[in-house]
Design a protein with these regions (language model features):
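Gly/Ser/Thr-rich loops at beta-strand to alpha-helix junctions
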Residues: 42-45, 65-71
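N-terminal glycine-/serine-/threonine-rich beta1-alpha1-beta2 phosphate-ribose binding loop
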Residues: 1-28, 171
Length: 213
């Protein structure tokens, strides 16, 4: 079955595709008014017109928490005023190799002996430069103050065996810090908890009781 034909036979389509296929599937699902659950949340930032299309067709776009934590607290804080959101991601070099940003900048991680900061910028810029690595930053930005105001640092650390994300949020209602150490899956660019997050999101659609925001 062609990817774009999935929406003809499904009520919910979960996307976990290479970036170049994101729009094809997204348009098909949204134009039919179905539920679109993208794991490549960073690609949603690049194709924001899909959100406008969803408003017209009645489709829903559900971004799962993925490898993050605390999005409920960020969303709640966003109902007031969030002053700043900063995320620091640290990954083993193998989980970052081949990222477009590294290729464009001519940065090699081979033989890295000590932690190295390889990116410092906005969540939007990070999602564009590391499309397979920091979809979590895109999700965080959508829950909070947006992709241009959310700050992101990415570090390559050869001493790590887990993908780590540390988040600091400063708001008028609270200041909080969150950290998670995710066990990588067979694909070192993502974590084992990501598919479980999708399952939890699907259960939430039909559960008798909903826990969390």
């Amino acid at each position: 079955m062609a990817a774009e034909a999935l929406s003809e036979n499904c009520d919910i389509v979960i996307e976990c595709l290479p970036p170049q296929l994101f729009r094809t599937v997204g348009v098909s699902v949204i134009d039919r008014g179905k539920i679109f659950m993208p794991l490549s949340v960073g690609q949603l930032l690049e194709h924001w017109d899909l959100v406008e299309r969803a408003k017209k067709t009645g489709a829903r776009i559900l971004a799962p928490t993925g490898a993050l934590l605390g999005l409920d607290a960020v969303r709640a804080a966003a109902e007031g005023t969030i002053h700043s959101v900063t995320m620091v991601t640290r990954k083993p070099p193998s989980g970052l190799e081949g990222a477009p940003y590294l290729v464009e900048q001519g940065i090699s991680l081979k033989g890295l002996k000590a932690p190295a900061k390889i990116f410092d910028g906005s969540a939007r810029e990070g999602a564009r430069g590391f499309p397979a690595n920091v979809n979590v930053a895109a999700a965080l930005s959508l829950a909070g103050i947006g992709p241009d105001k959310t700050r992101l640092e990415i570090w390559a650390d050869p001493a790590l065996s887990r993908n780590t994300h540390c988040i600091e949020v400063d708001a008028d209602t609270a200041r909080f810090f969150m950290a998670i150490e995710g066990i990588p899956s067979e694909n070192p660019r993502t974590g084992r908890i990501v598919p479980l997050s999708v399952i939890a999101a699907l259960r939430g659609l039909v559960a008798e009781i909903k826990v969390g925001t």
